[in-house]
C-alpha cells in the first residue's frame, strides 16, 4: 500500500491514497441538486503533474490543491484545512447533503403549493363574481321581458280600441249609405268594418300570445291581419277621397248659384241697403241671400219630370217632391248639403263678408263684396265636404291610440336599449373573467407540472445521494482491504 510522504514530522502517520483510488470517488456538485457529475481530473502546477506521473503527492501539494478549490467557491466562508476534511466522516457529509437537498426541495414544493392555493382562491373569487354577474344578467333579461310584455299589453289594448271603433263606424256608414242610397258610402263602411274585424283578430292574437299561446302561430296571424287591416283602411280612405271628389264636383254649382244670385240684382240691393246699415240690416240681408242661394242650388237637383196631382193631393205631392230633391242633394253632394244646410252656409258666408266690409270702412264696392262672399262659400263647402266624408271620432281614436302606442314603444325601446347596454357590459366582464380564469387555470397546470417535476427531481437526488453513500462505502471497504 502506498503512503503519502511529507516534509513535516507531524504528517508521518497520515495514510496516502493513490490517484487512481481518489479518482474513482464520485463527487456531488453543490449546483446540481444531487445529480451525478462527471469525474474531475485536475492538475495543479508542473510539480503536481510530475507527482501524478510518479503516482505520489505530498501533503502540502494536496493542501494547496484544496485551497485553490475553496478559493474558487464564491462568498465569504471558512476554509477548512485538509486534515479537517480527512477527519470528516463522508457518511455524515452525505447525510447532511441529503438533508439539505430534501430541505430545498421541500421549500420549493411548499412555495408551489402556496401558489396553487392562491390561484385556487383567485379562481373561487372570480367564479363567485361571475355567478353574481350571471344573476344580474338574468335579472336584466327578466326586466327586459317584463317591459316587452307590458308594451305588448298596451299595444293589444290600443288594437282592440281601434278595431272596435272602426267596426262601429263602418256599420254606421253602411246604414247611412243604405238610407241615403249612396253606394260609395256603403262600400266605405264595409271597408271600415273589414279593417275593424282584422284589427280585432290581430288584438286577439296579441292577447293570446301574452297568455302563453304558440308564439310563431300568433305572430303569423298578427302579420297577416296587419296587412289586411292596412289594405282595408287604404280602400276605405280611397273611397272617402272618391266621395270628396264627387261631392266637390256636385257642389261646384253652389258657388255658381251664389254668383248667380249676386248678379241677379241682389248685389245692387245690398249696395243700396248697406249705406248706414246696422246689425239688424246685415242679418236680414244675409238671411235673404241664404234663402235665394238655397233655392237656386236645389233647383239643380229637381227631377226632370214631375207627376200631375189632384188638388187635394197637391200638398202631399209637394212634400214628396221636396224630399226627393233633398235626397238627390245629399246623395250627390253630401249630408250637409240640404236646403237648410246650404242656406246656413250661404248666410254665414254673406254675413262674414258684410261685417268685414263694414269693419274696413270706405265705399262699399259690389265687386269686393262678391269676391269675399264667393271665397267664404268655397271655404265652407270644403269644410262641409271633409266633415261629411270623414269621422272625427275615428280620426281622434286613431291618432290617440297610435300616439300612445308610439310613446309606449319609444319608452320601452329606450329602457330596452339601457338594459341591453348593461347586458353587453356584463357579457364583456364575463368574457374578461373567463380569460383570467383560463390564465389562472393554465398557471395552475404549469405549477402542478413543476411540482411533479420537483418531486421527481427530489427522488432522483435522494437516489443519487444513496448511490454516493454506497459507492463511498465500497471505497471504504476497499481501503480497509488494502490496509489489511
Swiss-Prot record:
Coiled coil: 107-152, 413-457
Parts of the chain that traverse the membrane: 85-105, 152-172
Annotated localization: Secreted; Cell surface; Host membrane
Leader sequence residues: none
GO biological process: protein secretion by the type III secretion system
Effect of disrupting the coding gene: Mutant is severely attenuated in virulence. Disruption prevents SpvB-induced F-actin depolymerization in human macrophages without affecting intra-bacterial SpvB protein levels.
GO cellular component, one term: extracellular region
Main localization of the protein described in the UniProt heading: secreted
Source superkingdom: Bacteria
Topology versus the membrane: Multi-pass membrane protein
Entry keyword set: Coiled coil, Host membrane, Membrane, Secreted, Transmembrane, Transmembrane helix, Virulence
MF terms (GO), sorted A to Z: protein-folding chaperone binding
Subunit description: The core secretion machinery of the T3SS is composed of approximately 20 different proteins, including cytoplasmic components, a base, an export apparatus and a needle. This subunit is involved in the formation of a pore, called the translocon, in host membrane. May form a complex with SseB and SseD/SctB2. SseB is required for correct localization of SseC/SctE2 on the bacterial cell surface.
Described purpose of this protein according to its UniProt entry: Component of the type III secretion system 2 (SPI-2 T3SS), also called injectisome, which is used to inject bacterial effector proteins into eukaryotic host cells. SseC/SctE2 and SseD/SctB2 are inserted into the host membrane where they form a pore and allow the translocation of effector proteins into the cytosol of target cells. Required for the translocation of SPI-2 effector proteins. Required for systemic Salmonella infection of the mouse. Essential for SpvB-induced actin depolymerization in the host cell cytoplasm.
Family: Belongs to the SctE/SipB/YopB family.
Protein name: SPI-2 type 3 secretion system translocon protein SctE
Species of the source: Salmonella typhimurium (strain LT2 / SGSC1412 / ATCC 700720)
Gene name for this UniProt entry: sctE2
